[in-house]
């Protein structure tokens, strides 16, 4: 779920 973490940064 690395993508989910990236979305949080945006």
From Swiss-Prot:
A biological process term (GO) from this entry:
defense response to fungus
Keywords, A to Z, come to: Antimicrobial, Fungicide, Plant defense
User: Which superkingdom is the protein from?
Assistant: Eukaryota
Q: Quick check: keyword Transit peptide in the entry?
A: no
Q: What does this protein do?
A: Has strong antifungal activity against F.oxysporum, M.arachidicola and P.piricola, and weaker antifungal activity against B.cinerea, C.comatus and R.solani. Exerts antifungal activity against M.arachidicola with an IC(50) of 75 uM. Inhibits the proliferation of leukemia cells in vitro. Inhibits human immunodeficiency virus-1 (HIV-1) reverse transcriptase. Lacks mitogenic activity towards murine splenocytes.
| Sequence similarity | Belongs to the DEFL family.
This chain belongs to the protein called: Defensin-like protein
Q: Which organism is it from?
A: Phaseolus coccineus (Scarlet runner bean)
């Amino acid at each position: 779920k690395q993508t989910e973490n990236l979305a949080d940064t945006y």
